[in-house]
Amino acid sequence: MLEQQPTQNPLTVSMLNAQAQQVDRPLRENVKQAVRNYLRNLDGQDPTELYELVLSEIEHPMLDMVMQHTRGNQTRAATMLGINRGTLRKKLKKYGMG
């Protein structure tokens, strides 16, 4: 039987607005803004491997924080991430983390 996952709020990033008030924005909005800024600064050139660039900018710190949270326990980290341990080990190696 499928296990129901608890409803989770989207990941948010706390930011300060112009009035120095804390504002929580969904992570996806920050990613959209970062990609928008990146594309705007290309001076008309088309990027290559944009998908890999964005993915690595998100994946590396996520793996780092999950590994810290699990105190290096790869089995627990893989379970938290919803991937198998072999895939986790491959990703850790890719980023020089394992």
Curated annotation (Swiss-Prot):
InterPro entries: Fis_DNA-bd (IPR005412), Homeodomain-like_sf (IPR009057), HTH_Fis (IPR002197), Trans_regulatory_Fis (IPR050207). Homodimer. It comes from Glaesserella parasuis serovar 5 (strain SH0165) (Haemophilus parasuis). The keyword Iron does not apply. This is DNA-binding protein Fis. GO terms for molecular function: DNA-binding transcription factor activity; sequence-specific DNA binding. Activates ribosomal RNA transcription. Plays a direct role in upstream activation of rRNA promoters. It comes from the Bacteria. The lineage of its organism: Bacteria, Pseudomonadati, Pseudomonadota, Gammaproteobacteria, Pasteurellales. Coiled coil: none annotated. Gene3D superfamilies: Homeodomain-like. Residues 74-93 bind DNA. Keywords: Activator, DNA-binding, Transcription, Transcription regulation. Belongs to the transcriptional regulatory Fis family. SUPFAM superfamilies: Homeodomain-like. HAMAP family: DNA_binding_Fis.
